[in-house]
C-alpha cells in the first residue's frame, strides 16, 4: 500500500447532508443519538426490526430498512452506523441491494470513537511507524487488513472494514491449516478486562471447563458481578479474580467512573468523575501465577502498559495473545512496537473479533 491512497473524509462531511438515517438499534444507539442530537435524524433502520413494525426512540421511528428506504433515503440523506458489529456487511448491503451511494455511508463515529479512534493528523504523522508495523506482520492477510483499517480511519467508510478471513472464531486466529492462536484445554489464561464474566464463561465453555483463569477487573460494580458469577457457577477452583487494573506499575491510580455501554475504563486524570483503584503489574504476581499460556487484553487503551508490566513473564512463557488495539488511534503502532521490544522473535498478526472489523486486535503466536 502507498500511504495514503484514499481521499481524506472527516466526520464533519456529514453536515453536507440535510438528513441522517442511523443504522442499528442496539446498545450503541443512545451514544450515537447523543453525539448527533444537533443533526436532523429522520429515522433509525435496524435489520432485526420486523417488517411492518415501527418502534420509537426519542420520537424517531425505528424500522426495518426495507420499510423505510423509499420514504427516507434520497441524495441528501447520509447513513451513519449506530452499531459496532457488521458495519461492513451492512454497508455492502446498502450499496448492492438498496443502491445507496458509497459517499452517503459513514461508519460509527460517536464522540467517543471520534475522539480516540479517528485521528487523521496523527496517522499522517506516523506513516513511517505504520510502514514498520506492516513489515512486522506475519502474513499477507494481516497486512491487507491493516491497509484497510488505515483507509477506514481516514475516510469513515465502513466498506473498508472487510474482515480478515483468518479470524475463524472469537479469540481464534488461523495461522495455517494446522496452527491456530486460541485458548486451549489446560491453558493458564490471563483475562485482562474481565468485565462481568462474559469472557470467563467463554473460556470455560471452549476448554470444556479445563482451564485456569486469572481475571482482572478494576470497576467495583463489574467486579461484584464477576465475583457473583464465579460463586454461582462454582468456579472458585479454576478462576481467580483481582479487583485491579493491569499496568506497568503496581500502585493506586485514578480511573474514570464515566462508563458507557461497553464499561469503558479510561485511566485518565482529566475525566471529571474519578475512582481510586488498584493497578497491578503482572510480573509482580509471578509467585501467584504458575504459568501463562494465553493472554487476552481488552482494557480500554491501557494494553501497551499492561504488556510493559508483564514483559518478564511474557519472555519466560511465550504465551499466545489477543491484544485489543482499537481504543486509541496510536494503538496500531504503539502496541506492536512494545510487543516487538519484549520479544522480537514472536509472530504478530492483525485481526478483529468476528464480524467486527471496526475493532482491530493483535494476535501473537
Residue positions per predicted region:
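Phosphate/nucleotide-binding beta-alpha loop and adjacent structural elements of enzyme active sites
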Residues: 1-41, 47-365
Amino acid at each position: 500500500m502507498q500511504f495514503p491512497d484514499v481521499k481524506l473524509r472527516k466526520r464533519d462531511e456529514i453536515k453536507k447532508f440535510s438528513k441522517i438515517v442511523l443504522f442499528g438499534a442496539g446498545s450503541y444507539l443512545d451514544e450515537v443519538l447523543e453525539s448527533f442530537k444537533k443533526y436532523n435524524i429522520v429515522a433509525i433502520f435496524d435489520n432485526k426490526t420486523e417488517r411492518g413494525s415501527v418502534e420509537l426512540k426519542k420520537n424517531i421511528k425505528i424500522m426495518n430498512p426495507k420499510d423505510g428506504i423509499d420514504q427516507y433515503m434520497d441524495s441528501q440523506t447520509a447513513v451513519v452506523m449506530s452499531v459496532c458489529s457488521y458495519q461492513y456487511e451492512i454497508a455492502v448491503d446498502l450499496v448492492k441491494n438498496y443502491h445507496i451511494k458509497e459517499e452517503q455511508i459513514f461508519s460509527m463515529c460517536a464522540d467517543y470513537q471520534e475522539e480516540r479512534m479517528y485521528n487523521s493528523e496523527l496517522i499522517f504523522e506516523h506513516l513511517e511507524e505504520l510502514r514498520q508495523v506492516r513489515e512486522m506482520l506475519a502474513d499477507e492477510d494481516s497486512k491487507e487488513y491493516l491497509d484497510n483499517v488505515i483507509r477506514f480511519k481516514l475516510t469513515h467508510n465502513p466498506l473498508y472494514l472487510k474482515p480478515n478471513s483468518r479470524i475463524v472464531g472469537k479469540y481464534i486466529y488461523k495461522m495455517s491449516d494446522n496452527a491456530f492462536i486460541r485458548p486451549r484445554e489446560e491453558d493458564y489464561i490471563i483475562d485482562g478486562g474481565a468485565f462481568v464474566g462474559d469472557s470467563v464463561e467463554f473460556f470455560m465453555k471452549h476448554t470444556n471447563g479445563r482451564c485456569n483463569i486469572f481475571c482482572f477487573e478494576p470497576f467495583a460494580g463489574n467486579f461484584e458481578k464477576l465475583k457473583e458469577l464465579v460463586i454461582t457457577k462454582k468456579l472458585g477452583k479454576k478462576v481467580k479474580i483481582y479487583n485491579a487494573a493491569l499496568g506497568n506499575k503496581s500502585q493506586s491510580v485514578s480511573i474514570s467512573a464515566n462508563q458507557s455501554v461497553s464499561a469503558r475504563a479510561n485511566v485518565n486524570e482529566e475525566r471529571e468523575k474519578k475512582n481510586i483503584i488498584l493497578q497491578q503489574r503482572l510480573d509482580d504476581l509471578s509467585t501467584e501465577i504458575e504459568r501463562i499460556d494465553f493472554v487476552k487484553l481488552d482494557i480500554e487503551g491501557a494494553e501497551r502498559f499492561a504488556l510493559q508490566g508483564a514483559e518478564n513473564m511474557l519472555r519466560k512463557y511465550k504465551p499466545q495473545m489477543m491484544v485489543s488495539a482499537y481504543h486509541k488511534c496510536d494503538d496500531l503502532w504503539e502496541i506492536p512496537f512494545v510487543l516487538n521490544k519484549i520479544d522480537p522473535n514472536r509472530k504478530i498478526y492483525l485481526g478483529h473479533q468476528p464480524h467486527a472489523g471496526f475493532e482491530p486486535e493483535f494476535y501473537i503466536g
